[in-house]
Amino acid sequence: MSFEWPWQYNFPPFFTLQPNVDTRQKQLAAWCSLVLSYCRHRKLYTLDVLEAQESPVFNNKKIERKLSVEAIQVVFEELRKKGNLEWLDKNKSRCLIMWRRPEEWGKLIYQWVSKNGMVNSVFTLYELANGDDTEKEEFHGLEDWMLLRSLQALQTDGKAEIITMDDGKGVKFF
């Protein structure tokens, strides 16, 4: 299944941050939406600012336009403000991208657990993210850091408890 680009992606001015405040706000909202949709489609969880400039999301070779590194940082800062991005280093060169926040992943996981009658069951983190039973679920293949944060959100809500097992971490659902 190929990614469907929004109409703005083929509009050259989209690749230059606009000076008008209202226009810029709409433009940044469109960029944020595009980045999250693209990362979701490709199941990307980490991004590098310099590498991002060469990726298709910020570099439209068809119209020969690419977003500057400075503009990418503005888009990333907007994503951070919305809770969809977290910097991995002080230089702000690498980041975690959360196209779905931990609470949202937790809700999806808990719905699956409930739907399949597995409340009061214990799972390893591997079973949840990579097991045969979850193969058709959206959270299948979820990176460990995001899975753990999702389960921590469920633990805060009293729906799960993260436990330490001999071979790593596990979780019990309530």
UniProtKB/Swiss-Prot annotation:
GO cellular component, one term: ESCRT II complex
Keyword Cytoplasm: yes
Record-linked Gene3D superfamilies: Winged helix' DNA-binding domain. Chain C. Domain 1, Winged helix-like DNA-binding domain superfamily/Winged helix DNA-binding domain
SUPFAM superfamilies linked: Winged helix' DNA-binding domain
GO molecular function, one term: protein homodimerization activity
InterPro entries linked: ESCRT-II_cplx_Vps25-sub (IPR008570), ESCRT-II_cplx_Vps25-sub_N (IPR014041), WH-like_DNA-bd_sf (IPR036388), WH_DNA-bd_sf (IPR036390)
Domain of life according to the entry: Eukaryota
Cysteines engaged in disulfide bonds, as pairs: none
GO biological process: protein transport to vacuole involved in ubiquitin-dependent protein catabolic process via the multivesicular body sorting pathway
Keywords, sorted A to Z: Cytoplasm, Protein transport, Transport
Locations listed in the record: Cytoplasm
Family to which this protein belongs: Belongs to the VPS25 family.
Function summary: Component of the ESCRT-II complex (endosomal sorting complex required for transport II), which is required for multivesicular body (MVB) formation and sorting of endosomal cargo proteins into MVBs. The MVB pathway mediates delivery of transmembrane proteins into the lumen of the lysosome for degradation. The ESCRT-II complex is probably involved in the recruitment of the ESCRT-III complex.
Record text on subunit structure and interactions: Component of the endosomal sorting complex required for transport II (ESCRT-II), composed of SNF8, VPS36 and 2 copies of VPS25.
Protein name in UniProt: Vacuolar protein-sorting-associated protein 25
Organism in which the protein naturally occurs: Danio rerio (Zebrafish)
Gene: vps25
